Amino acid sequence: MQPDVATLTLPFTDSLITIGTTMHGGAIASLIDTAAMVAAWSDDSVPADLRGTTVSLTVIYLATAEHEDIQATARVLRRGRNLVYLDVEVQSLSGKSVARGLVTYKLG
């Protein structure tokens, strides 16, 4: 893992299906939120004992994830004193864009 970037993979399982073989949007949103949190905490200057929370989460669904694993890459756009602003891109492992997320995460 490098500072200000985190990449997480969500394997497709039947428990994530909403209709047919389509992955549920809530699972995709949760992946975006988790990847953003990991990237927010990836800076070496952040003490290990701090707590944090998601302040805002916007998800744009671009395509369905059909019976395939997906991967989210979160990148820090800006670090403020307490808030971290992040962009998260979700793709299938074959490279299809599935969703985009904009996250504000509060440290402390």
Regions found by a protein language model. Give the residues of each.
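Hydrophobic/basic alpha-helical segments enriched in Actinobacteria
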Residues: 2-5, 9, 45-47, 62, ...
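Residues that recognize and position ribonucleotide moieties
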Residues: 21, 30, 50, 96
